[in-house]
Swiss-Prot record:
It comes from the Bacteria. This is Formate--tetrahydrofolate ligase. ATP binds at residues 67-74. GO terms for biological process: tetrahydrofolate interconversion. Gene3D superfamilies: Domain 2, N(10)-formyltetrahydrofolate synthetase, Formyltetrahydrofolate synthetase, domain 3, P-loop containing nucleotide triphosphate hydrolases. Signal peptide: none annotated. Pathway: One-carbon metabolism; tetrahydrofolate interconversion. Belongs to the formate--tetrahydrofolate ligase family. NCBIfam families: PRK13505.1 (NF010030). GO terms for molecular function: ATP binding; formate-tetrahydrofolate ligase activity. It holds the Pfam family FTHFS. Keywords: ATP-binding, Ligase, Nucleotide-binding, One-carbon metabolism. It comes from Cereibacter sphaeroides (strain ATCC 17025 / ATH 2.4.3). The lineage of its organism: Bacteria, Pseudomonadati, Pseudomonadota, Alphaproteobacteria, Rhodobacterales. HAMAP family: FTHFS (MF_01543).
Length: 557
C-alpha cells in the first residue's frame, strides 16, 4: 500500500457542503455564515436559542508528557468523535484552532492526522476564518492606545515603568521577546521597555475562549489591567475606552467555526490558547453549543494532563460550570520509552524495560485525572514500530493503576480502528462522575500554586521571592484572590526542567514572574525558563513548506 501523507489524505476526503453538516445538527442554513463551501461560523442568534436544551456528556481527551512531535491527542479526539458516531451515538468534537508558530516551527498542525483529521486541513492550519488575526488586532489596538494615551498627555497617570500590557503576533520569534519602543525622538513618544508574546498567550485569546456572549466579552475586555500608576493603583482597558472597539474587532471571531472530519462528522474548531503558557482549551461558547446539539462532546486540552487537563478542570470547567463525564489519557509506546530514558533516535527499537520505567509517567497522569473525580481510560495511540510485547506491558501497567488501556488504530483505520475505545467511553460516561476542582476559590493565590505543584507535579516546594509574594498579596487585597491560577511551565516534564522525564518526586518549582489576567479571570505563574514568545528550532518546518508547480501546498503536516 502506498504511504499517504496527512495532507494527501485530507485532500482526497469526500467533503460535504457545510450546510449538510449543519443540518445534521439541526442548524438552519440561514444561521450559518459560510467561509467557502466547507467551513462556516454559527450565528449568535442560533446559539442563544439553545439555552433551554439539556446538555450532552462531555468527554476530555488528554495525554502523558509528550515527545516534541506530540502524541496524537488531537488525532485521538477526532478519531473518538468519529468512533462514537460509528457506533450510533450523536457526537461532536471540539478542538482548538492552529497557531502559525508551531506550524512553521517544530510541532506541525492541529487538525489531527492520518484517517482521523478535520478538514479543510490546509485552511485550518493557516489563516482559517481569520479569528487569530482578529485577536491579534484587538490586542495590539489596546497596545497602540496605551502609548497614544501617554503621548497625548497621560491623563490617567500611567507609570511607563509599570505598563504590563505587551504586544502579540502569531509567530515564533525570539527576537521580539524584549525591546525598547518609541525610539527616534520626541515625535515618536516616550521610550520604554516592552516586548511581544505569541498570540495564543494573549489575554484577549483567553477572554474570547472564556466569554459566554458578546456582552460578557466586552465586560471582560474592559477589566483587563494594562498597568499601574505611581501610587500602584491599576489602570484598566475601559479607562482607555478601548474595550468597545476591541469587541467590534472580535464580534465575528466570537462565533464558533463549524467544519467536518474526514468521515463527515461535525467539528467545532474555535479558539487556540497553548496549554504550556496559557489555559490550553477551546472556547466555552463552542463547547456549550456542542453540548446542546449532541449526546457526546469530545474535546481536548493541550499537552499532558499536568498542564491541559489541570487547567481544563480548574479554569474552564470551574468558570463555565462544566462537568466532564469521562477522560481519555492518550499514551504512545514511543513517549513512554522516552520517559524511560530512551533517546529520540532509538524510539523505534523494542525496549520493554525502558517502557516499563516510563510507565510511571502514565501512572502519574492517571492518578491526577482520577484525583478530580473523573473516570479515566487509557488510549494507546498505535505506531507501526510498536511491538506486541510493548503494548501488553502498557495494558498490564494501566490495569494495575485501575484503568483499562485500549489499543487504537484510528490514524490508519479511522473510526473502525477506535470502536473499542468509543464503547468504553460510553460505559464510563454512564457511571457517576464526582468531578471537583483541585482547590477552592477562597484559597490564597500562592497556596493554589503550591497545591498544583505538590499534588499534580509532586514537587516538594514552590520557590518565589518576596516581590512575587507581595504582588500576589496585593492582588488579593484588590479583590482578585478568588481567581484560579494558570501555571506556565514546560510541557515535557512534571518539573520545570524539560530534560527530566518520568515521574520525578520532591523537586522545586521556581516561579519567575506572575501576571494578572483580570479580564480572563486567572493569575498566571511563569515557572522555570518557559517563554510566552517561543523561538523557532534549528531546522524549522517552514524550510520544507512550499508551493509546487500547480500552486498546491507541500510540506504542511
Amino acid at each position: 500500500m502506498t504511504f499517504q501523507s496527512d495532507i494527501e489524505i485530507a485532500r482526497a476526503a469526500n467533503k460535504l457542503p457545510i450546510q449538510e453538516i449543519g443540518a445534521r445538527l439541526g442548524i438552519p442554513s440561514g444561521d450559518l455564515i459560510p467561509y467557502g463551501h466547507d467551513k462556516a461560523k454559527v450565528s449568535q442568534g442560533f446559539i442563544r436559542g439553545l439555552a433551554d436544551r439539556p446538555d450532552g456528556k462531555l468527554i476530555l481527551v488528554t495525554a502523558i508528557n509528550p515527545t516534541p512531535a506530540g502524541e496524537g491527542k488531537t488525532t485521538t479526539t477526532v478519531g473518538l468523535g468519529d468512533g462514537l458516531n460509528r457506533i450510533g451515538k450523536r457526537a461532536v468534537i471540539c478542538i482548538r484552532e492552529a497557531s502559525l508558530g508551531p506550524n512553521f516551527g517544530m510541532k506541525g498542525g492541529a487538525a489531527g492526522g492520518g484517517r482521523s483529521q478535520v478538514v479543510p486541513m490546509e485552511d485550518m492550519n493557516l489563516h482559517f476564518t481569520g479569528d487569530f488575526h482578529a485577536i491579534t488586532s484587538a490586542h495590539n489596538l489596546l497596545s497602540a492606545m496605551i502609548d497614544n494615551h501617554i503621548y497625548w498627555g497621560n491623563d490617567l497617570g500611567l507609570d511607563a515603568r509599570r505598563i504590563t500590557w505587551r504586544r502579540v503576533m502569531d509567530m515564533n520569534d525570539r527576537a521580539l521577546r524584549d525591546m525598547v519602543v518609541n525610539l527616534g525622538g520626541v515625535s515618536n513618544g516616550f521610550p520604554r521597555q516592552t516586548g511581544f508574546d505569541i498570540t495564543v498567550a494573549s489575554e484577549v485569546m483567553a477572554i474570547l475562549c472564556l466569554a459566554e456572549d458578546l456582552e460578557d466579552l466586552e465586560r471582560r475586555l474592559g477589566g483587563i489591567v494594562v498597568g499601574y500608576r505611581r501610587d500602584r493603583s491599576p489602570v484598566f482597558c475601559r479607562d482607555l475606552k478601548a474595550d468597545g472597539a476591541m469587541a467590534v474587532l472580535l464580534k465575528d471571531a466570537m462565533q464558533p467555526n463549524l467544519v467536518q472530519t474526514i468521515e463527515n462528522n461535525p467539528a467545532f474548531v474555535h479558539g487556540g490558547p497553548f496549554a504550556n503558557i496559557a489555559h490550553g482549551c477551546n472556547s466555552v461558547i463552542a463547547t456549550r453549543t456542542a453540548l446542546k446539539l449532541a449526546d457526546y462532546v469530545v474535546t481536548e486540552a493541550g499537552f499532558g494532563a499536568d498542564l491541559g487537563a489541570e487547567k481544563f478542570f480548574d479554569i474552564k470547567c470551574r468558570k463555565a460550570g462544566l462537568k466532564p463525564s469521562a477522560a481519555v489519557v492518550v499514551a504512545t509506546v514511543r513517549a513512554l520509552k522516552m520517559n524511560g530514558g530512551v533517546a529520540r533516535e532509538d524510539l523505534g527499537r523494542e525496549d520493554v524495560a525502558a517502557l516499563k520505567r516510563g510507565c510511571a509517567n502514565l501512572g502519574r497522569h492517571i492518578a491526577n485525572v482520577k484525583g478530580f473525580g473523573v473516570p479515566v481510560v487509557v488510549a494507546i495511540n498505535h505506531f507501526t514500530t510498536d511491538t506486541e510485547a510493548e503494548i501488553e506491558a502498557v495494558r498490564a501497567y494501566a490495569a494495575g493503576q485501575g484503568a483499562e488501556a485500549i489499543l487504537c488504530r484510528h490514524w490508519a483505520d479511522g473510526s473502525a480502528g477506535i470502536e473499542d475505545l468509543a464503547r468504553k467511553v460510553v460505559q464510563l460516561a454512564e457511571t457517576p462522575s464526582m468531578f471537583a476542582p483541585l482547590y477552592p476559590d477562597e484559597m490564597p493565590l500562592f497556596e493554589k500554586m503550591e497545591t498544583v505543584a505538590r499534588r499534580i507535579y509532586h514537587a516538594h516546594d514552590v520557590i518565589a521571592d518576596h516581590v512575587i509574594r507581595d504582588q500576589l498579596r496585593a492582588w488579593e487585597d484588590a479583590g482578585y484572590g478568588a481567581l484560579p491560577v494558570c501555571m506556565a511551565k514546560t510541557q515535557y516534564s512534571f518539573t520545570t526542567d524539560a530534560a527530566i522525564r518520568g515521574a520525578p518526586e520532591g523537586h522545586s518549582v521556581p516561579i519567575r514572574e506572575v501576571r494578572l489576567s483580570a479580564g480572563a479571570g486567572f493569575v498566571v505563574a511563569i515557572c522555570g525558563e518557559i517563554r510566552t514568545m517561543p523561538g523557532l528550532p534549528r531546522e524549522p518546518a517552514a524550510e520544507v513548506i512550499r508551493l509546487n508547480g500547480e500552486g498546491r501546498i507541500e510540506g504542511l503536516f
